[in-house]
């Protein structure tokens, strides 16, 4: 599954276009490598996303084309959250 689609379906990022912009700015990495919006995501991958002053690392649990809002958080596990610049 494409990175931008995963981020939107899992609701880590609200819109797919925003996920693409964030990836194009170099703020997302997959398993330590900088990722593009079109990069493939697989279960077991570790994603690191920089949201402003926060760095969030998650592990991909499962991939779904669509999901209910209540079940979206089951698609990933948060491994680490850290604040930057403090």
Swiss-Prot record:
Keywords: Protein biosynthesis, RNA-binding, rRNA-binding, tRNA-binding. GO terms for molecular function: rRNA binding; tRNA binding. Transmembrane segments: none annotated. The keyword Membrane does not apply. GO terms for biological process: rescue of stalled ribosome. Residues 1-62 form the S4 RNA-binding domain. Disruption phenotype: Not essential; synthetic growth defects can be seen in double rqcP-ssrA mutants. Double rqcH-rqcP deletion strains grow normally in rich media. Loss of Ala tailing, RqcH is still recruited to the 50S ribosomal subunit. In vivo mild decrease in tRNA(Ala)-binding by RqcH. It comes from the Bacteria. GO terms for cellular component: RQC complex. Associates with stalled 50S ribosomal subunits. Binds to RqcH, 23S rRNA and the P-site tRNA. Does not require RqcH for association with 50S subunits. Crystallized 50S subunits are variously associated with an A/P-site tRNA with or without RqcH, as well as with P- and E-site tRNAs but no RqcH. Displaced from the 50S subunit by puromycin but not thiostrepton. Key component of the ribosome quality control system (RQC), a ribosome-associated complex that mediates the extraction of incompletely synthesized nascent chains from stalled ribosomes and their subsequent degradation. RqcH recruits Ala-charged tRNA, and with RqcP directs the elongation of stalled nascent chains on 50S ribosomal subunits, leading to non-templated C-terminal alanine extensions (Ala tail). The Ala tail promotes nascent chain degradation. RqcP is associated with the translocation-like movement of the peptidyl-tRNA from the A-site into the P-site. Activity of this protein is best tested in a clpP or ssrA deletion mutant; ssrA (tmRNA) encodes the SsrA tag added to nascent proteins in stalled ribosomes by trans-translation, which targets the nascent protein for degradation. Belongs to the RqcP family. This is RQC P-site tRNA stabilizing factor.
């Amino acid at each position: 599954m494409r990175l931008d689609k995963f981020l939107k379906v899992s609701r880590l990022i609200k819109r797919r276009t925003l996920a693409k912009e964030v990836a194009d700015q170099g703020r997302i990495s997959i398993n330590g490598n900088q990722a593009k919006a079109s990069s493939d995501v697989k279960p077991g991958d570790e994603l690191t996303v920089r949201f402003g002053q926060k760095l969030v690392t998650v592990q991909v649990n499962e991939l779904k084309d669509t999901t209910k809002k209540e079940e979206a958080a089951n698609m990933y596990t948060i491994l680490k959250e850290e604040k930057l610049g403090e």
